[in-house]
Amino acid sequence: MHFLDDNIQIKIDKFYKKNSLNKNRVIVAFSGGADSTTLLLNLKYYLSNNIVAFYFAHFIRTDNEQNKEIEHVKGFCDLYNIALQVKKCDIDIKSESVRLGVSIEELARKCRYNALENALKENDANYIALAHNENDQIETIIMRFFQGSFLDGLSGIPGVNKNIIRPLLEVSRLEIENFLSLNNISFFVDSTNAQDLYLRNRVRNNLLPSIEKIFKGYQKCLKRISEFSKEFVDYFEKDEFFPVEKGKYYYSFDLKTFLNFPKYLVFRLIFKILNSEGIVAKVSYKALNEAFKVEINRKKNNVLLKTNDFFLEKRHNKINLIFKRDEKFYKPFDFILEVGKWHSLSLGKILLKCLECNTSSVSRLKCCSYEFRYKFFKDRFKAKKFFSKFIRCNPIYLMLLALDNRLIGIIDLNTLNLVWSEKSILKKISISLIGGLLKE
C-alpha cells in the first residue's frame, strides 16, 4: 500500500522509536470516522497488516445510523483486507448512566475500554491503539484546565499508558483531512459530532473558535504548558517526598507532615495510592481541601473524608487512608471461640482455633472487635486510658479476647501479633491464627 502523503507514516515511526515499542500485533479501535480510519490504514502499512480492527457499537444513536456505520466498517475492512471484530454493547447505556448517576460519555467510555481489553487478550495482542490526535490533546487540556485539574491533568493525554498507545498525538486534524482527501479514502461521519450534546463537542464547536479569535496560535502555548507539566509530574513520580507507613489495608501519614507539605504533593500521593489499589475515585478539590482544616492539637479523632471505597481519618498524630475492602469486616463482631473448633473472619481470611485449655474453668473464649471495648470496664475514663497504650495500632484491626467478661488479650489482625495479654490466664490457652489480611 502506497500513500500520496507519507508525513503521518514518518510521525508514527518517530512515535514508535521514541517510546521503544515493538511491532507486535495491535488492536486498533476503529469507529469508521476520519481519525480512526487514518490510524487503521497507516498502522496496517507500518505493521505489515499485523493488526485487528475493533468496532464497538454503543447504540446510543438511532439503530438505523448505528447499523449503517457497522455496514461501512465491515465493507471498509473487507476492501483493505483487514481483520475485524464487532462487539455490540450488552447494556442500555442511556438508562444505565441515569441509574448509576454518571454521564453517558463516561459509561460509554468504560464499556468500550473493557471490550478493548477483552479483545487484546482474545487476539494475543500487545497494544490497543487509539486515534486521539493533536487537536484532541488541546481540547483535553482546555477541559481539564476549566475543571480545575492538577498538573497531572494539564500534562494531557499520555502517548503510552501501559498497553494503550496513541500514535497520532502529534498529527493535527488538518493533516488527517489532507491524508484522506489526497488518497481518496472514504470515512463515516458521526451525526453527533456537530451537535452540542457532549462536553467535548461544546468545547470544540463553541469555545475553541472564540479562543482562536483572541489568542492566535494558542495551541503552541498549551502544548508547551503540557510539556512542562509532564516534566514536573515525571520528576515527582521518581522520588518519594512524603513518608508513608503502609499496612495491608491502609496507609498512614504523620499528621504534621501531612498538613505542612504542599497540598499538590499530598493530593497527588493520595490519588497515586488509590490508583495503585485499583480504586478510581472522583474526589473534588474542595472535599480534599477540607482535610487540611483539621487542627493539629485537637485531641478528638474524626473522619475527614468518606467515600464508598475508602475513608480518610485523623487518629491521634496520624492521618490514615483506609480502604473499605469488605463492609462485613467493619461491622462489630462478637462470637464465642470454642475449644477444638475453627472460626473464620471473612475479610482477612483469618482462621482462629482454641487448641487446648489447661484448666477446666476455661472452655469458651469470647472474641470481639474494638467497638465492644467499653464492655470490659466499669469506668469509661479507665477504658480510654487503657486503650491509649495502643494508639500505634489501627483500631479497625484490633481483636479483643475476653473470658468471663474480663479482657485477657488483644490481637492486631493486621500483623497477627499479640499486642497485649493477661499472662496469668492466657498462658493456659493455646490459640492458632492462620492467614493474614491478604488482598483479594
From Swiss-Prot:
Any one GO MF annotation of this record: ATP binding
InterPro entries assigned: Rossmann-like_a/b/a_fold, TilS/TtcA_N, tRNA_Ile_lys_synt, tRNA_Ile_lys_synt_N
Reactions this protein catalyses: cytidine(34) in tRNA(Ile2) + L-lysine + ATP = lysidine(34) in tRNA(Ile2) + AMP + diphosphate + H(+)
Signal sequence, renumbered to the chain: none
Top EC class for this record: ligase
Primary localization: cytoplasm
Family per similarity comment: Belongs to the tRNA(Ile)-lysidine synthase family.
Entry note about domains: The N-terminal region contains the highly conserved SGGXDS motif, predicted to be a P-loop motif involved in ATP binding.
Protein name listed in UniProt: tRNA(Ile)-lysidine synthase
Lineage, highest ranks first: Bacteria, Pseudomonadati, Spirochaetota, Spirochaetia, Spirochaetales
Gene: tilS
